[in-house]
Design a protein with these regions (language model features):
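Short, conserved clusters of charged catalytic residues that mark active-site
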Residues: 1, 18, 130
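Active-site Tyr-X1-5-Lys
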Residues: 1-15, 37-44
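Active-site "gating" loop of Rossmann-like NAD(P)-dependent oxidoreductase/epimerase domains
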Residues: 7-9, 27, 48-51
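Flexible, glycine-rich beta-alpha linker
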Residues: 15-35, 60
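C-terminal substrate-binding subdomain of Rossmann-fold SDR/epimerase-dehydratase oxidoreductases
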Residues: 32-165
Length: 165
């Protein structure tokens, strides 16, 4: 918020982008979706038992493909209004369990989910979802990549990465 104060005092053009959960190719495996994708690829290649080690699968998040995030940032640079705060999100609440099931179906696998106690966070937010209406209305931006396309891209990325392990 300090930057907004400076924008008013110094007449700088500043906007605040509030990013929610981004996912996409090349993301590190310590994030939930790429971590699961890596495990699914390893299962399909016979490098791991058909069990996904995971934290809490019943929380929800607002995931947005990183390519849509980049487009949102460009839209803000071109059309965003000075001093405004924008949520960069899909506006769709996704349960982690559902995304894992979708990825397993894409991969053609049946897997067991194993809750790994070391991956649980005691102060985990149960639900996270944003509203990107202001961003859409003021810049004309809208997400262009479906969650299914994103999950397919993440799985394809991990296919190549596991080959190099």
């Amino acid at each position: 918020l300090l930057c907004l104060q400076w924008s008013y005092q110094e007449h700088w053009r500043i906007m605040v982008a509030r990013p929610f959960n981004h996912i996409g190719p090349r993301q590190r495996e310590d994030f939930v979706i790429p971590g699961v994708a890596r495990q699914l690829v390893r299962i399909r290649k016979g490098l791991q038992a058909a069990r996904i080690d995971i934290g809490d699968v019943d929380v929800t998040r607002d995931f947005l493909d990183v390519r849509d995030v980049i487009n949102a940032y460009f839209s803000l640079l071109e059309s965003g209004q000075n001093g405004e705060i924008y949520n960069v999100c899909s506006g769709q609440e996704q349960r982690i369990r559902s995304l894992i099931e979708q990825m397993a179906a894409i991969a053609g696998l049946n897997v067991d989910l194993h809750q790994d106690q070391t991956r649980l966070r005691p102060s985990e937010q149960r639900r996270v979802m944003g509203n990107s209406l202001k961003l859409k209305e003021q810049t004309g931006w809208k997400p262009g990549i479906s969650i299914t396309e994103t999950l397919q891209s993440v799985l394809s990325d991990w296919e190549a990465r596991v080959e190099r392990e």
